[in-house]
């Protein structure tokens, strides 16, 4: 198969979302004195993280919108402290988002992969992330020069894994389905989404999770 266009997920495929976000949350924990309410940062993180992942899954499926996600993820950990004011919660979220744009830790091998691909392929980011942070993250981490364009779910008005965002990406990059490839870490969003859109896939799977329902292309 001769590929010409490669679509790559950003979060946890290139940009180390887990560690970068954890670092930001630890800064918030210190700066907002959450230690007055939680026994440790890890106790705070262990409550926040599963809830945040659940919210993102609901966002991908269309069960909730962006505003619900960004409000509820911090409201969930602040409500037990007696903090339910929407303005305060959104302020904490905005602070968190701003901090994420300054973090530059990459997934091991990310630059080497892009250096290998850039001479031979057209490269695009395909992400469910938010516009106000994704471009800054890409630029500050030194990744922007590798890509022709970033396609966001906010542009397509639909999230991965839905077929519509893949169709949107193909149309807006003048790419052919048969000559395109999707690289990502999320089995549901990236791999199932691309598979159902009849786009070949490379699954970044460092944890060695089992494929369910079909075998990815690579």
For each of these PLM feature ranges, what is it?
Residues 1-6, 19, 111, 115, ...:
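Asp-based, Mg2+/Mn2+-dependent phosphohydrolase catalytic module
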Residues 2-108:
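N-terminal helical cap/lid subdomain that shapes the substrate entry/recognition surface
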Residues 14, 106, 123, 158, ...:
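Conserved SAM-binding loop
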Residues 121-124, 177-179:
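Short beta-strand/loop segments at the ligand-binding rim of alpha/beta enzyme cores
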Residues 51, 119-120:
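Structured helix-beta-strand junction loops
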Residues 127:
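Conserved phosphate-coupling serine/threonine residues in phosphotransfer and NTP-handling enzymes
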Residues 120-121, 198:
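Glycine-centered short loops/turns at secondary-structure junctions
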């Amino acid at each position: 198969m001769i590929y010409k266009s490669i679509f790559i997920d950003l979060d946890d495929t290139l940009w180390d979302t887990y560690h970068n976000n954890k670092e930001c949350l630890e800064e918030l924990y210190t700066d907002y004195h959450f230690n007055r309410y939680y026994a440790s940062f890890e106790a705070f993180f262990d409550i926040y993280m599963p809830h945040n992942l659940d919210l993102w899954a609901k966002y991908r499926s269309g069960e909730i919108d962006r505003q619900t996600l960004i409000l509820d993820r911090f409201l969930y950990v602040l409500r037990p402290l007696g903090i339910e004011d929407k303005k305060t919660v959104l302020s904490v979220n905005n602070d968190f988002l701003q901090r994420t744009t300054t973090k530059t830790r990459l997934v091991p091998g990310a630059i080497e992969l892009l250096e290998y691909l850039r001479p031979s392929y057209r490269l695009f980011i395909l992400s469910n992330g938010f516009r106000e942070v994704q471009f800054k993250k890409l630029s500050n981490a030194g990744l922007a020069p590798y890509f022709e364009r970033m396609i966001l779910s906010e542009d397509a008005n639909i999230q991965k894994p839905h077929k519509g965002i893949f169709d949107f990406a193909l149309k807006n990059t003048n790419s052919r389905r048969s000559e395109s490839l999707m690289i990502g870490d999320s089995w549901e969003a990236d791999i199932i989404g691309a598979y159902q859109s009849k786009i070949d896939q490379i699954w970044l799977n460092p944890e060695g999770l089992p494929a369910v329902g079909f075998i990815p292309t690579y």
